[in-house]
């Protein structure tokens, strides 16, 4: 009898783990979020498909309570896809809309001036890319501002040098995005990233011919 009592806590612990694991593997996406700022209390927040219909039957919404919100997407019914989380348009100023991949598991979301989402494989990768994107945008913006100021001062030599650095910096970021898209090939995030910086594009010439152009150099690729 005593042996059975000793085994009971271990049994309960195992049962708790199994039940906890069920939530992560039941084909549902649990979005658990917080919004920083008391002024958003009671305001509505929305989960909107990034692509496709955005009519009422495809959009989820709820009121923020105690700075928190919670959504459940059932992927036995819904298609795994990209979503955008954002507040009612009257209250979006100062808050960054957030892209997420709606996939099974629990996604931890923070809506703020810089928003974040982590907790599932694709969303963890998306968050890492988002951090790199913010660094890229900030530094590239500073370089471009510097170029404008140098040109105003008549210093075209230094402006040209910084432009070359900016071009190289931007190309490195595009290649980083392309490589991540390749690593995520076949997944929703891979498709999203792949469409951001294609390697080529088509252009119609004055004579009517359609040619393939290098997206990085804007030069024609010989057939």
Regions found by a protein language model. Name each.
Residues 37-38, 201-203:
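Alpha-helix capping and inter-helical loop/turn segments
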Residues 22-174:
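A non-transmembrane, solvent-exposed segment enriched in polar/low-complexity residues
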Residues 207-223:
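N-proximal helix/coil linker or "cap" segments that precede and/or mark the start of modular domains
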Residues 151-152, 182-189:
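Surface-exposed helix-capping loop/turn segments at secondary-structure junctions
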Residues 1-34:
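Bacterial Sec-dependent N-terminal signal peptides
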Residues 168-185, 203-209:
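Amphipathic alpha-helical coiled-coil segments
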Residues 186-200:
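Amphipathic alpha-helical repeat scaffolds of TPR domains
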Residues 120, 187, 219-221:
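Serine-centered coil/turn micro-motif
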């Amino acid at each position: 009898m005593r042996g059975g009592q000793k085994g009971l806590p271990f049994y309960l612990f195992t049962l708790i783990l199994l039940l906890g694991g069920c939530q992560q593997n039941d084909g549902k996406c649990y979005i658990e979020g917080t919004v920083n700022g008391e002024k958003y209390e009671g305001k509505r927040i929305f989960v909107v498909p990034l692509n496709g219909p955005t009519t009422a039957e495809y959009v989820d919404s709820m009121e923020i309570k105690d700075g928190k919100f919670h959504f459940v997407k059932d992927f036995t019914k819904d298609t795994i896809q990209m979503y955008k989380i954002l507040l009612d348009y009257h209250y979006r100023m100062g808050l960054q809309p957030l892209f997420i991949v709606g996939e099974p598991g629990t996604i931890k979301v923070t809506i703020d001036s810089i928003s974040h989402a982590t907790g599932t494989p694709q969303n963890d990768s998306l968050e890492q890319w988002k951090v790199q994107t913010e660094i890229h945008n900030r530094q590239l913006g500073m370089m471009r501002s510097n170029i404008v100021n140098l040109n105003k001062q008549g210093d075209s030599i230094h402006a040209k040098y910084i432009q070359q650095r900016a071009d190289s910096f931007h190309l490195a970021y595009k290649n980083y995005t392309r490589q991540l898209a390749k690593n995520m090939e076949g997944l929703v995030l891979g498709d999203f990233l792949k469409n951001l910086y294609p390697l080529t594009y088509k252009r119609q010439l004055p004579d009517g011919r359609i040619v393939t152009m290098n997206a990085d150099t804007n030069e024609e690729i010989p057939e």
